[in-house]
């Protein structure tokens, strides 16, 4: 074997090893059983939404690592904050992976939802007038999002709370988001999130959502956000 051929084979092997060693984004297990959110969200919807839709976002995002090797060293939150550097596939699937991971953690069985903390209620009252007024504004954002997208409660850079919505799989962490902030609560209003149970009745899905909001997690996120 000539030295040049041997060198080529070594470099090729090194490249293969390097590619196979790239870290992949992982889909975390659901923090509850797929039937835990019934009757608000039915088991079949959860199985398809988590097991097929969310999984597809993770798989498709990992497929982009070959195009952008630096992704294997980028965590999911950091990816959102620099999403404009990447192509549409990374934006859609990276956003989809983050949004769904965030969404699952935003939900809990009705006996484990908790309540908004006094500190959060105080800020909600200051920025929206009351908890009910906040929910109404959030409902309007969710129902008013044309087509597919998300509704969000965020902490803005100036420390105030705001309700916003994003199209497709965008989110407020993205550097190209029209309204930026740290998300505390998000609602998926893509049809795949509710159509099996609610068909075209998005308003009924939004109403049911409030019975499974994980306020314990929202409180935790708020406490972290105001420290920054």
Curated annotation (Swiss-Prot):
It is an enzyme of class 1 (oxidoreductase). Destroys superoxide anion radicals which are normally produced within the cells and which are toxic to biological systems. SUPFAM superfamilies: Fe,Mn superoxide dismutase (SOD), C-terminal domain, Fe,Mn superoxide dismutase (SOD), N-terminal domain. Residues 1-23 form the signal peptide. It comes from Acinetobacter baylyi (strain ATCC 33305 / BD413 / ADP1). This is Superoxide dismutase [Mn]. It is found in: Periplasm. Its EC number is 1.15.1.1. InterPro entries: Mn/Fe_SOD, Mn/Fe_SOD_BS, Mn/Fe_SOD_C, Mn/Fe_SOD_N, Mn/Fe_SOD_N_sf, SOD_C_sf. Transmembrane segments: none annotated. Keywords: Manganese, Metal-binding, Oxidoreductase, Periplasm, Signal. Mn(2+) binds at residues 49, 100, 188, 192. Its cofactor is Mn(2+). Binds 1 Mn(2+) ion per subunit. It catalyses: 2 superoxide + 2 H(+) = H2O2 + O2. Its main location: periplasm. One of its GO terms (cellular component) is periplasmic space. Belongs to the iron/manganese superoxide dismutase family. One of its GO terms (molecular function) is metal ion binding.
